[in-house]
C-alpha cells in the first residue's frame, strides 16, 4: 500500500465511524505560544480537551503534519543515523471529545490494523498502564488477545503516574493512562519487548498510541475523574507504511525513496544508500512545510530552527560533492509526492523554492571557509576528542554554522563538541531558539462558564439582556455592590469580545444598577464583561440595558477595516509571501505585523499608502457574508495566520476583487468611512517580520497637521520656506558630522597621550603587566579606545579601567590574548561589578560593566591585584 493510499484509508475508515475529517493544522501552533512547532495530532484540539473550546463535532480524525526539531521534542541530531527519526512526519489520529472511550477506541484501533490493513495478529502485542485493569480486560476479553501479549507498564519514570503508559499535558490538567500497539519485526532483528532491558532495540516498534484522558491532576497532585473523558490517539504514517511495504527503515518507503532518488539527481551521486541522501530527503519535507506555514529563516525562534535544518541539508549535499545550490530544486519533487494531500504546498511551492535558494546562496558564501576552519580544528586536536566551545562559537558567529551542524561533523569523525563552553557564549540565543510545550491547567480552581453568548453587535450597539452569571476572583457570586468590580455573563450582548487582534468593546450596563463596562473578553464562546459598578446593586437575574460606546466602536472599525486594505496592498506591492503575523486594532491606531525579508523602500512605502487611500476614495461597500469554510476558501478568502475558524465563517469583501478575508471583527459600512489612511512607522520586530503602525480618520488628519506644524517651525528656525527646510537640515547635519570627526580625532590623540602616561603605571606580575586605574573619561567609547591603546602599548597585560560620571560607574577589563588561558576579562568584571552594584560580562579578552554605587569602587579596585596574582 502506498503512503498516499494509507493516509486516505485511515481517514476514510474513521469517517465511516462518524468522525469528522479535520484538515492538518499549521506547523506553527495558533493556540499555544509556548510550543515551538506542532508535534502531535492533538495540538490543534488542545483547547477542546481543556474545555475552552466547543466544536460542532465530538469525533475527529486527522493526518497532522508534525515537526520535531528544536525545543523539548528534538529529533534533528538523530536524523540520518537511525531508521525512524525524522524532523518532519505525519501523525494519523482519531479523537473523541467526551464521546466514546476505551472500549470503542481499542476496537477501532484493532479493526483498522487487522481487518483494514490486514496485519497478522501474531505480529502484534500491546502495553497498558499497570493499574488500568479496564484496558487490560478489553484487550484480553473483548479483543481476545492472550495475556502474554498484554504487557503492564508501571511507573518507570521515577515517580507516581510517571510512566511510558501514562500521559499528561503538563504538571497539572487533563491526563490519563494509555495503551500502545507494537509490531514485532521478528527474531532476526535485535531487541526485546517493551518493559524489558532490550526494549530500545528495533525488533518491537510502537505503531499506535491510544491515550485515555480520564483524570484531572491538581497542583497538589490530587487526581480527580473528568466529567467527560476523552481519547487522543496517534500513529506515525511513515512507521506503519514501512510495515505494510515490507521494509524495516522508514527511508525505504515509497515516499522517501522517490525523494532520495530526486536528491541523488540534484547532488550528482548514484549511491542511493548514502546516509546524506536520507538527511536531505527528510529535511526538504520539514523545511518546505515550515515555509508554507509562514516560518522564514532567521536567527531566533522557529526561524532559527528552520535555518539550522536548511544548513544541515546543504552541508550534507556539500559532503556528497555538490558545491553549488541544489536544495531548492527538490521542492518540485516533494510537491509530486505530497501536493495532492496538502494543496497548500502546490500553491506556495515557488515561494518555498525562492526562500530556500536565497538561504542557500547566503550560506554558500561561508560554507567552504567554515569547513576549512573546522577541519583544521579537528586535525589540531591530536589525541583529544572534544572540539573546544570557542571554536564551535566562532563557526556559528563568523561562518553561520549552527552548533548541531558542527556536532554532526564531529560525530562523523568520532568526536564531540564542548557544549558547555559553547552554551556560555550562546545561552541567550539558545533560550530564544529553543522552546518546549508546557500545557498546564488547574481546572479544580477555575469557574466553569458553559454555553455561548449570543452576539448581536454586528447590527446593534444597544439591547437588553439578563445577567446569567457574575464572577469575582474566579468564584461565582450572586451580586456586585457599588464600588465593586467583576466579570458579568449575559444571555446576549452587543459588546464585541477581544479577539482577532481587535480590542473589546466598552460601554454601560444599566438597570437596577449602573455598571461601566471597561473591557470585554471571551472564554470559549462566552463573552465576559469587565464591569465597575458605579451605582446600585447588580445581581444575577437582573434585566439590563446594554450600551456600547459608539465613538470607540466606530473608531476601532475604521482601523480594523484599514488593516484589511493594508494587508492586500502589502501583498500586491511586496509579493504573495506577505502573511499577517499579528495585529492590534483599537480606537487610537492600528498595528500590523507581516512577514517580509527586508525593510520597505521609500517607494514601496508610498505605493502601499497610496493604494490603501485609493480604495478609501473609491468608497467600496464592505460586504459581509456567512458561509461554510469550504465555500469561503473557494471564494478566495484569506485565512489569517494563527486564527481558528469554525465550520461557518464570516467573509468580508472590500471591492469586487480587492480584499476578501475571513474575519469576525467589526467594520465600516463603506471604505470611504475610513477618510484617510496614514502610515506613521515601519520597522523590523524580528528576523523576517516587519511592523507597520498607522492612523485613520481624524487621528490621521491630526497627525498630518502636526507634521505640517512641526515643519513650519523648523523652516522658521532657518528663516526658510517649508520647501527649502530639508536642504537647510541636510547642510546642518553635514556640518555636525564634520565637527564630530574632528572631535573624534582629538579624543584619539588624548587617549594616546593618556595611554602613554597610564602605561608607565603598570606593575609587573608573574611575567606580565597589571594596570588598575580610575580615569577621567566621559563616555564608554572613550574608555574602550583607551583600553585598546593600553593593550597595544603593554603587549602582555591584564587591565582594569574605571570611570565615574554623573554618579554612574563604568568598568572595562582587557586581557591580552596570550593571558586569556588563565585570566578572563569576563570573570574579572563579574568579580568587580557587585562592589558597585552593577553587573556585566563579555569575552575572555574584553568585558564591560556598569554600576550605580561609586562608593564601592575603591574597595573593588584594591582587590584586583590579588585576584589576578592567583591566576597568572
Swiss-Prot record:
Keywords annotated in UniProt: Aminoacyl-tRNA synthetase, ATP-binding, Cytoplasm, Ligase, Metal-binding, Nucleotide-binding, Protein biosynthesis, RNA-binding, tRNA-binding, Zinc
Reactions performed catalytically: tRNA(Ala) + L-alanine + ATP = L-alanyl-tRNA(Ala) + AMP + diphosphate
Record's cofactor remark: Binds 1 zinc ion per subunit.
Subcellular location: Cytoplasm
Signal peptide: none
Xref: Pfam families: DHHA1, tRNA-synt_2c, tRNA_SAD
A GO term from the CC aspect: cytosol
Gene3D superfamilies for the chain: 2.40.30.130, 3.10.310.40, 3.30.54.20, 6.10.250.550, Bira Bifunctional Protein, Domain 2, Threonyl-trna Synthetase, Chain A, domain 2
Cofactors demanded by this protein: Zn(2+)
Listed EC numbers: 6.1.1.7
InterPro entries according to UniProt: aa-tRNA-synth_II/BPL/LPL, Ala-tRNA-lgiase_IIc, Ala-tRNA-ligase_IIc_anticod-bd, Ala-tRNA-synth_IIc_core, Ala-tRNA-synth_IIc_N, Ala-tRNA_ligase, Ala_tRNA_ligase_euk/bac, DHHA1_dom
Major enzyme class: ligase
GO molecular function: alanine-tRNA ligase activity; aminoacyl-tRNA deacylase activity; ATP binding; tRNA binding; zinc ion binding
Residues the record lists as binding Zn(2+): 560, 564, 663, 667
Cited PROSITE patterns: AA_TRNA_LIGASE_II_ALA
GO process terms (BP): alanyl-tRNA aminoacylation; negative regulation of DNA-templated transcription
HAMAP family, per the entry: Ala_tRNA_synth_B
Family to which the UniProt record says this protein belongs: Belongs to the class-II aminoacyl-tRNA synthetase family.
Biological role: Catalyzes the attachment of alanine to tRNA(Ala) in a two-step reaction: alanine is first activated by ATP to form Ala-AMP and then transferred to the acceptor end of tRNA(Ala). Also edits incorrectly charged Ser-tRNA(Ala) and Gly-tRNA(Ala) via its editing domain.
PANTHER family in alphabetical order: ALANINE--TRNA LIGASE, CYTOPLASMIC (PTHR11777:SF9), ALANYL-TRNA SYNTHETASE (PTHR11777)
Domain notes: Consists of three domains; the N-terminal catalytic domain, the editing domain and the C-terminal C-Ala domain. The editing domain removes incorrectly charged amino acids, while the C-Ala domain, along with tRNA(Ala), serves as a bridge to cooperatively bring together the editing and aminoacylation centers thus stimulating deacylation of misacylated tRNAs.
NCBIfam families recorded: alaS (TIGR00344)
Name of this chain's protein: Alanine--tRNA ligase
Amino acid at each position: 500500500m502506498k503512503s498516499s493510499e494509507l493516509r486516505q484509508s485511515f481517514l476514510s475508515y474513521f469517517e465511516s465511524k462518524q468522525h469528522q475529517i479535520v484538515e492538518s493544522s499549521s506547523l506553527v501552533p495558533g493556540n499555544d505560544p509556548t510550543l515551538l512547532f506542532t508535534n502531535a495530532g492533538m495540538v490543534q484540539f488542545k483547547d477542546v480537551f481543556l474545555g475552552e473550546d466547543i466544536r460542532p463535532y465530538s469525533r475527529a480524525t486527522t493526518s497532522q503534519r508534525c515537526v520535531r526539531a528544536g525545543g523539548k521534542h528534538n529529533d534533528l541530531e538523530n536524523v540520518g543515523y537511525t531508521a525512524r527519526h525524522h524532523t518532519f512526519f505525519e501523525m494519523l489520529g482519531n479523537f473523541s471529545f467526551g464521546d466514546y472511550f476505551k472500549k470503542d477506541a481499542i476496537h477501532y484501533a484493532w479493526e483498522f490494523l487487522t481487518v483494514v490493513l490486514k496485519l497478522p495478529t501474531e505480529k502484534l502485542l500491546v502495553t497498558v498502564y499497570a493499574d488500568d485493569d479496564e484496558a487490560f480486560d478489553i484487550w484480553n476479553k473483548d479483543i481476545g488477545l492472550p495475556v502474554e501479549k498484554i504487557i503492564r507498564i508501571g511507573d518507570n519514570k521515577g515517580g507516581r503516574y510517571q510512566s511510558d503508559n501514562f500521559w499528561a499535558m503538563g504538571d497539572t490538567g487533563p491526563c490519563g493512562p494509555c495503551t500502545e500497539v507494537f509490531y514485532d519485526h521478528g527474531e532476526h532483528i535485535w531487541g526485546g519487548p517493551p518493559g524489558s532491558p532490550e526494549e530500545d532495540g528495533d525488533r518491537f516498534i510502537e505503531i499506535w498510541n491510544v491515550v485515555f484522558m480520564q483524570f484531572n491532576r491538581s497542583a497538589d497532585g490530587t487526581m480527580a475523574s473528568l466529567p467527560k473523558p476523552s481519547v487522543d490517539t496517534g500513529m506515525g504514517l511513515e512507521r506503519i507504511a514501512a510495515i505494510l511495504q515490507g521494509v524495516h527503515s522508514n527511508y525505504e518507503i515509497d515516499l522517501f525513496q522517490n525523494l532520495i532518488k530526486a536528491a541523488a539527481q540534484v547532488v550528482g551521486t548514484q549511491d542511493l544508500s548514502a546516509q546524506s541522501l536520507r538527511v536531505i530527503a527528510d529535511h526538504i519535507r520539514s523545511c518546505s512545510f515550515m515555509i508554507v506555514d509562514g516560518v522564514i529563516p532567521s536567527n531566533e525562534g522557529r526561524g532559527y530552527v528552520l535555518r539550522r535544518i536548511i544548513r544541515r541539508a546543504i552541508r550534507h549535499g556539500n559532503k556528497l560533492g555538490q558545491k553549488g545550490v541544489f536544495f531548492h530544486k527538490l521542492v518540485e519533487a516533494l510537491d509530486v509526492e505530497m501536493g495532492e494531500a496538502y494543496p497548500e504546498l502546490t500553491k506556495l511551492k515557488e515561494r518555498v523554492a525562492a526562500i530556500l535558494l536565497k538561504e542557500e546562496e547566503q550560506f554558500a558564501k561561508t560554507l567552504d571557509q567554515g569547513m576549512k576552519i573546522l577541519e583544521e580544528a579537528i586535525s589540531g586536536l591530536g589525541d583529544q576528542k572534544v572540539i573546544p566551545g570557542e571554536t564551535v562559537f566562532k563557526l556559528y558567529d563568523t561562518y553561520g554554522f549552527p552548533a548541531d551542524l558542527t556536532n554532526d561533523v564531529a560525530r562523523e569523525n568520532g568526536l564531540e563538541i564542548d557544549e558547555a563552553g559553547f552554551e556560555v557564549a550562546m545561552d541567550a540565543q539558545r533560550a530564544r531558539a529553543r522552546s518546549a510545550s508546557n500545557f498546564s491547567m488547574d481546572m479544580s480552581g477555575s469557574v466553569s462558564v458553559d454555553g455561548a453568548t449570543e452576539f448581536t453587535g454586528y447590527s446593534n450597539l444597544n439591547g437588553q439582556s439578563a445577567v446569567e452569571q457574575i464572577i469575582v476572583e474566579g468564584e461565582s457570586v450572586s451580586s456586585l455592590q457599588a464600588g465593586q468590580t467583576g466579570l458579568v455573563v449575559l444571555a446576549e450582548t452587543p459588546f464585541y469580545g477581544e479577539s482577532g487582534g481587535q480590542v473589546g468593546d466598552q460601554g454601560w450596563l444599566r438597570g437596577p444598577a449602573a455598571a461601566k463596562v471597561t473591557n470585554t473578553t471571551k472564554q470559549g464562546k462566552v463573552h465576559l464583561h469587565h464591569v465597575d459598578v458605579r451605582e446600585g446593586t447588580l445581581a444575577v437575574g437582573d434585566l439590563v440595558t446594554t450600551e456600547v460606546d459608539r465613538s470607540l466602536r466606530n473608531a476601532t472599525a475604521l482601523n480594523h477595516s484599514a488593516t484589511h486594505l493594508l494587508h492586500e496592498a502589502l501583498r500586491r506591492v511586496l509579493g504573495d509571501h506577505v502573511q499577517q503575523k499579528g495585529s492590534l486594532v483599537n480606537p487610537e491606531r492600528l498595528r500590523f505585523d507581516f512577514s517580509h525579508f527586508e525593510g520597505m523602500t521609500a517607494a514601496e512605502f508610498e505605493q502601499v499608502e497610496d493604494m490603501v487611500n485609493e480604495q478609501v476614495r473609491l468608497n467600496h461597500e464592505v460586504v459581509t457574508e456567512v458561509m461554510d469554510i469550504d465555500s469561503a476558501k473557494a471564494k478566495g478568502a484569506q485565512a489569517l495566520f494563527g486564527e481558528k475558524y469554525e465550520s461557518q465563517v464570516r467573509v468580508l469583501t472590500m471591492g469586487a476583487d480587492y480584499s476578501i478575508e475571513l474575519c469576525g471583527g467589526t467594520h465600516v459600512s463603506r471604505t470611504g468611512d475610513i477618510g484617510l489612511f496614514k502610515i506613521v512607522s515601519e520597522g523590523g520586530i524580528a528576523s523576517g517580520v516587519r511592523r507597520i503602525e498607522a492612523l485613520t480618520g481624524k487621528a490621521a488628519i491630526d497627525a498630518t497637521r502636526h507634521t505640517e506644524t512641526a515643519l513650519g517651525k523648523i523652516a522658521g528656525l532657518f528663516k526658510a520656506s517649508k520647501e527649502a527646510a530639508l536642504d537647510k537640515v541636510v547642510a546642518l547635519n553635514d556640518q555636525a558630522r564634520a565637527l564630530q570627526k574632528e572631535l573624534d580625532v582629538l579624543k584619539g590623540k588624548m587617549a594616546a597621550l593618556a595611554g602613554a602616561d597610564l602605561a608607565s603605571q603598570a606593575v609587573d606580575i608573574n611575567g606580565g603587566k597589571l594596570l588598575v586605574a580610575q580615569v577621567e573619561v566621559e563616555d564608554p567609547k572613550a574608555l574602550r579606545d583607551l583600553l585598546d591603546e593600553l593593550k597595544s602599548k603593554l603587549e602582555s597585560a591584564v587591565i582594569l579601567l574605571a570611570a565615574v560620571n554623573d554618579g554612574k560607574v563604568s568598568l572595562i577589563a582587557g586581557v591580552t590574548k596570550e593571558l586569556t588561558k588563565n585570566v578572563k576579562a569576563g570573570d574579572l568584571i563579574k568579580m568587580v561589578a557587585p562592589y558597585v552594584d552593577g553587573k556585566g560580562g563579555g569575552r575572555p579578552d574584553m568585558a564591560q560593566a556598569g554600576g550605580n554605587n561609586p562608593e564601592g569602587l575603591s574597595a573593588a579596585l584594591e582587590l584586583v591585584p590579588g585576584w589576578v596574582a592567583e591566576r597568572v
